[in-house]
Amino acid sequence: MILPYYITIPLLSAFLISLIAGKKDKWAILLSTTAGASMLILSIYSLIAQNGETFIYKMGFWSLPVGIVLVQDGLACLMLVLVSLISFTSLIYSVQYIRHMDRNWKYYALFMLLVTGMNGVIITGDLFNLFVFMEIALLSAFALVAYGGQAEEYEAAFKYAVMGALSSTLVLIGIAILYSATSTLTMAKM
């Protein structure tokens, strides 16, 4: 089952970029574009091979209320292709765009965390992990907005952080209301 690779490939590449590529930006570019290309190939393969089926993958060996459930249906396949295509083309474009900045490996590590969060939001099967992946994407996007280090970017990042905190609070309240009404966080049981 290839479903967990949508999360592990960009997460592992973000870790490796932070660990290995901290001194050389070329390694960060190579690792991130390789991860982006592999995600694009994997998502296109999933879209072709899916045949209208729904795949469910339980991460770990825990039962459903505790374990992480990943779900891939036709809409998730299409969304994964779109996220992979846009993120890969953004990575290719950003090589030239951020070339003048220092420590570009941080940009690529944050970008891979953003992809991890977006992919997790698409394929998660429960509301708690949806919130966790949404927060991963939100925090990495916040850091990417402030990445350039200029006053306008910090102002935009602050505004984004305020809106993100408000939206996260509202989502968490909504999840609490749904949990109190249904006694489950699994989306398929609601």
Language-model features and meaning:
Residues 13-16, 31, 38, 79, ...:
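Hydrophobic residues within membrane-embedded alpha-helical segments of Major Facilitator Superfamily
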Residues 5-9, 31, 78-79, 119-141, ...:
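Hydrophobic alpha-helical membrane segments of integral membrane proteins
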Residues 21-22, 49-51, 125, 148-150, ...:
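Short helix-capping/hinge motifs at transmembrane helix termini and TM-loop junctions
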Residues 17-22, 117-123:
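Hydrophobic alpha-helical transmembrane segments
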Residues 23-37, 99-113, 128-131, 149-170:
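Membrane-interfacial loop-to-helix junctions in multi-pass inner-membrane proteins
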Residues 1-5, 14-109:
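Transmembrane helix-loop-helix hairpins at membrane boundaries of multipass inner-membrane proteins
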Residues 49-67, 170-190:
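Juxtamembrane/interfacial segments at transmembrane-helix boundaries in multi-pass membrane proteins
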